[in-house]
Amino acid sequence: MKVFILALLALAATTAIAQLETTCSQGFGQSQQQQQPGQRQLLEQMKPCAAFLQQKCSPLRMPFLQTQVEQLSSCQIVQYQCCQQLAQIPERTRCHAIHIVVEAIIQQQSQQQWQEPQQQAQHKSMRMLLENLSLMCNIYVPVQCQQQQQLGQQQQQQLQEQLTPCTTFLQQQCSPVTVPFPQIPVDQPTSCQNVQHQCCRQLSQIPEQFRCQAIHNVAEAIRQQQPQQQWQGMYQPQQPAQLESIRMSLQALRSMCSIYIPVQCPAPTTYNIPLVATYTGGAC
């Protein structure tokens, strides 16, 4: 019986996807003709996401399954396929892929029923769906694509100054703060905790698309500095161990700051960064 139910589910899902892909193909026909071959391939790959973003899905009618399993909707199936496709696309090209899809949808709808006020509302709705994709798929989907330009040396230096707390935290150059009171009501903060808070605050003020460049500039500065200091005269195997420690600290920052920090930067990256006031204080 279970095999029979699963077979019916698979059949219904396949039928729904086939119908959605037909609709997608018809809707994106003109857009695909105007795209480059690489973009056309991405559009083809992202059909489930296009169908989901356009909400071209409906409940699957399977009344005989109501008492056995929860009825799936074609949206749920398409969402799953969309997430599966996104996960297979490298992170650095994910933004480009999803925005090709959105642009195709917007161009199609602009040629159809949307007048100016309705079009703006539709664009806002599309943006919200895009942001929700990150949560639904549990993967990073940028809202804005990075432009392929290099940061200047002065901007990199400004970023490093701005992220001095992160440098201090990653190097673990902090120690317990002596607070004789109150020992029982609250835990004594450490200078590491203070610096971590400052680091997270500075990172949150940097636009999301520039955080990777910023945090990796810091890590690179630490890497270049350390061989000239404590690693001189020591065995080389200790240096990779230190770099691994920095990488682990970088990953820890993602959860501690509750903000997105890529572990690997797409290359090349980005453009002029709106910098906030740089950090000039001490550890506390």
Swiss-Prot record:
GO terms for molecular function: nutrient reservoir activity. CDD domains: AAI_SS (cd00261). It comes from the Eukaryota. The keyword GTP-binding does not apply. Keywords: Disulfide bond, Seed storage protein, Signal, Storage protein. Residues 1-18 form the signal peptide. Contains disulfide bonds. The keyword Disulfide bond applies. InterPro entries: Bifun_inhib/LTP/seed_sf, Bifunc_inhib/LTP/seed_store, Glia_glutenin. It holds the Pfam family Gliadin. Seed storage protein. Might be integrated via inter-chain disulfide bonds within the glutenin polymer. Belongs to the prolamin family. This is Avenin-like b7. The lineage of its organism: Eukaryota, Viridiplantae, Streptophyta, Embryophyta, Tracheophyta.
